Design a protein with these regions (language model features):
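Class I S-adenosyl-L-methionine-dependent methyltransferase catalytic core
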Residues: 2-238
Length: 238
């Protein structure tokens, strides 16, 4: 039985190599190939209980690498940009899938709202701060230090249009965002994201959150915890 499983894994790996074209050593090639073989098509609701071996798992808010894998397997990009790559999940996923990748972050010296970022990307993955839910640095250019929600949304809007212009015709921008509560008030940041550019929205995907404090807390009364984020897919016309 163990031999058969190894043969199946090896076959899946070879199929993955033939399909995606591996150019760099992977963290776990056979596991990734097996995931791609078994994955179901992307739908409007996704759940990733495990984040996988990609990126720095100590980086605050680092998302699951399986989300990036599913986006890349669905849209088949040849050139990916992550303008706020944080813990490097997207960089490592693209390396493992043999996809040309460019990534920047303020902590490595690039201000994505002002500095050159290249051009002609067919997929941009963008996971900005959720306003000041987590403050990522002392740098005043950090979006998490924007101050008011109005100022944050103004910077988010300016960033969105800058990134959108870097897409090739037919390219997509996937923006991962979550809502928050502040002093008892619900702030629907995901709704604000949809309002950035309604005419170019192609899909909205609800992503279940795992391993957050709301999962482990028992609430009483009428309080409803936030256990989801959304990925809004914007598509530049072909």
């Amino acid at each position: 039985m163990a031999t058969n499983n190894k043969q199946k894994s090896a076959t899946a790996y070879l199929l993955f190599v033939a399909t995606y074209g591996i150019t760099e050593a992977m963290r776990d090639a056979q596991a990734l190939a097996e995931y791609l073989r078994q994955r179901t098509p992307l739908t409007s609701v996704v759940s990733y209980p495990q984040r996988g071996p990609w990126g720095n798992n100590r980086y605050p808010g680092n998302c699951s690498g399986y989300l990036l894998i599913d986006l890349c397997a669905t849209y088949r990009p040849t050139c990916v940009l992550d303008p706020m790559e944080g813990g490097g999940t997207s960089r490592e996923v693209c390396a493992d899938m043999g996809i040309t990748y460019t990534g920047f972050d303020l902590h490595s010296g690039t201000d994505s709202l002002r500095d050159p970022l290249g051009t002609a990307y067919d997929l941009i993955f963008w996971h900005p701060p959720y306003h000041d839910m987590k403050v990522y640095s002392d740098d005043p250019r950090d979006l998490s230090r924007a101050g008011s929600l109005v100022a944050f949304m103004a910077l988010l809007r300016a960033s969105y249009w800058r990134f959108f212009e870097l897409l090739v015709p037919g390219g997509r921008l996937a923006l991962l965002m979550g809502d928050l509560r502040r002093n008892g008030r619900y702030e629907p940041l995901t709704l604000d994201v949809a309002r950035l550019d309604r005419q170019h929205i192609e899909s909205i995907i609800i992503k279940t959150q795992h391993n957050v404090s709301s999962n482990r807390t028992q609430y009483g009364g009428t309080f409803v915890p936030i256990l989801h984020e959304t990925i809004t897919i914007f598509r530049r016309p072909a």
